[in-house]
UniProtKB/Swiss-Prot annotation:
PROSITE patterns: RIBOSOMAL_L22
Protein name: Large ribosomal subunit protein uL22
UniProt-listed InterPro entries: Ribosomal_uL22, Ribosomal_uL22_bac/chlpt-type, Ribosomal_uL22_bac/org-type, Ribosomal_uL22_CS, Ribosomal_uL22_sf
Function: This protein binds specifically to 23S rRNA; its binding is stimulated by other ribosomal proteins, e.g. L4, L17, and L20. It is important during the early stages of 50S assembly. It makes multiple contacts with different domains of the 23S rRNA in the assembled 50S subunit and ribosome. The globular domain of the protein is located near the polypeptide exit tunnel on the outside of the subunit, while an extended beta-hairpin is found that lines the wall of the exit tunnel in the center of the 70S ribosome.
Any single GO BP term: translation
Pfam hit, one: Ribosomal_L22
GO cellular component terms attached to this protein's record: cytosolic large ribosomal subunit
UniProt-listed SUPFAM superfamilies: Ribosomal protein L22
Amino acid sequence: MFEAKKSAKATLRMIKISPRKLNLITGLIRNLKVSDAIMQLKFSKKRAAVDVKKCLQSAIANAENNDGLDIDNLVVLEAIVGKGSVMKRLVPRARGKAFRIKKFFSNLYITVSEIK
């Protein structure tokens, strides 16, 4: 969609939210200008929006400080959600039994790039 010149990346690992829920938020910001993406995340009521916003701001800072890119021309090129590790816990039940519950973690990879 956009012709990218240079890009900067940021990753956030071991986020305590399932990848399925996190992917709902990242779908909102893909292919948006960075300023529009931050506004989307700022007014979102989802809990995952805070973590995505933190990772996006890290990618913006990497683009500005490491690569010298102009913030006004940055676009969210990729927002990829990966499956992290799964923490397994036991919940005591009746008659001495125990049920296993899974707590999912996610990894988030955001790439921003400067457009022409």
